Amino acid sequence: MDDKMNYYPISREEWHGFYHDGKAPLTEAELDNIKSVNDQISLKDVQEIYVPLTHLIHLYMKEFESLTLSKGLFLHEYVSVPPFIIGIAGSVAVGKSTTARLLQRILARTFKRRNVQLITTDGFLYPNKVLEEQGIMDRKGFPESYDMEKLINFLNEVKSGKDEIKAPVYSHSVYDVIEGEYELIQQPDILIVEGINTLQLPANQQIYVSDFFDFSIFVDADPALIEKWYLERFGALLDTAFLDPNNYYYQYAIGKREDAFAMARNVWKTVNLPNLEEYILPTRGRADIILHKTENHLIDQIYLRKY
């Protein structure tokens, strides 16, 4: 079954025509600071893709606030507007992090009085020590490697308006959750949640992460392209890791390059590709917006959910 049958397919040119105000919401220097390793994005992408997307998100936000007000009228009591949560899903190396950081910056710039924060679900991975104890270190990134109950409780606290919540922090250079290190989430008006598992429906859960989302985005591309980007990113990480013995990639950076890339290709084949095909791609049809990428991370097609 076509998982895009209930979407409006929109070309890049048509999408840009829906909303453009001629103003650049950020500078080239700010954009360079936002980009992930080896990701490619330009101010033209910001204007043609992300400015209209921000406008669409604002429409969803207004409807969300209106519904909250209506609930209060029905209940004959004041109901505060909970945080508006945006979920961003997609494969490893597809550019989710850049999309998330860019949206955070544009939303904060556009809605100056709104507190816009961002977390990644990587922080809710079980620590490596736990994965090793459970014998699932080779399944890191698969659904069972995440503490979903902890993530769901975190999102429930966010929606409930708790003053200050600790979000665990993951380090890609250490390749592990950093014990005792947290990011403070302090009553955001908008929270962006980025991760490969944000739209998944684990069989053992009665409440899903996506139940807390008010808008969701899936960053999509052909798996062969994603593999190419994954290997390019791996090479870029090796180029800096050899300077730091504490970096997870140091062991590969100081050895033979061909051996390191053979390892990376094997990880893609045995971990990332199966995870994409079995658990990530099947969630694509649950997103409100699909951003489809082609060569050089260029977004060529947008899919807007009909219903």
UniProtKB/Swiss-Prot annotation:
HAMAP family xrefs: Pantothen_kinase_1
Subcellular location: Cytoplasm
Enzyme class: transferase
Xref: SUPFAM superfamilies: P-loop containing nucleoside triphosphate hydrolases
Taxonomic superkingdom: Bacteria
Keyword Transferase attributed: yes
Source species of the chain: Enterococcus faecalis (strain ATCC 700802 / V583)
Alphabetic keyword roster: ATP-binding, Coenzyme A biosynthesis, Cytoplasm, Kinase, Nucleotide-binding, Transferase
CDD domains membership: PanK
Name of the protein: Pantothenate kinase
InterPro entries: P-loop_NTPase (IPR027417), PanK (IPR004566), PRK/URK (IPR006083)
Binding of ATP, residues: G90, S91, V92, A93, V94, G95, K96, S97
GO molecular function: ATP binding; pantothenate kinase activity
Family stated for the protein in its record: Belongs to the prokaryotic pantothenate kinase family.
A single GO BP: coenzyme A biosynthetic process
Pathway where this protein functions: Cofactor biosynthesis; coenzyme A biosynthesis; CoA from (R)-pantothenate: step 1/5
GO CC terms in record: cytoplasm
Catalytic activity field: (R)-pantothenate + ATP = (R)-4'-phosphopantothenate + ADP + H(+)
EC number: 2.7.1.33
Disulfide bonds: none
